[in-house]
Amino acid sequence: MPVPRPAPPPGVLERLTYVQAPPRQVWATLHDPAAQDALFPELKLGPPVPSWPAAGATRSARLRVGLLAANVRLESLEARPASRFQMILVGDGVRLSRGWYLEDSAGGTRVAATAELATTGRWTTHLIGLGRGSAASLIETHLRILKEMAEGGRPASEVHRRAAGRG
């Protein structure tokens, strides 16, 4: 039985999109190791542990939001295949919570993506703002790329080049 998607708490950004692909395909795209650089352009991901994306699994990464660059640790908080995935990124002065809720809808998938970006200290906040970084830009870019990849089956390298403005 599907787990209902909770309403996002105050301060958490949510964006919705419809993907013309079944939830299993969207889930597979979200966790495809070859697609990670394209799907998460703000992250330089370290190697995953064998259990990734299972809840409790961790991995390292380098996060770049706006002008801020920080080493972070990712932790998978919840992983329900073809249904839900939540993770948190924690680094020096920054915390980013991300969530994806996949719902079978009209032969495709309704994807609700959430993000909450929290910072400590004025410098961290200013570096993100000066570079025009935000949780909204992260989540909107991610959803656009996820939709393109899941629907069109484009190779990750092609989508990554387009996202970076090189193609």
Regions found by a protein language model. Name each.
Residues L16-Q20, R62, E75, I88, ...:
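Generic structural detector for well-ordered beta-strands
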Residues T58-V65, F85-G91:
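Short beta-strand segments that buttress and anchor functional surface loops
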Residues M1-A54, A164-G167:
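Hydrophobic ligand-binding cavity/cleft-lining segments
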Residues R64-A70, T119-W123:
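Short, cysteine-centered beta-strand-loop-beta hairpins and adjacent loop/turn segments enriched
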Residues P48, K147-G167:
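Short, highly charged C-terminal tails/helix-capping segments
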Residues V12-E14, A69-R73, R95-G99, R110:
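Short, surface-exposed coil-to-beta transition loops
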Residues I88-T141, L146-E148, S157-V159:
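Beta-strand/loop substructures that line and gate deep hydrophobic ligand-binding cavities in soluble
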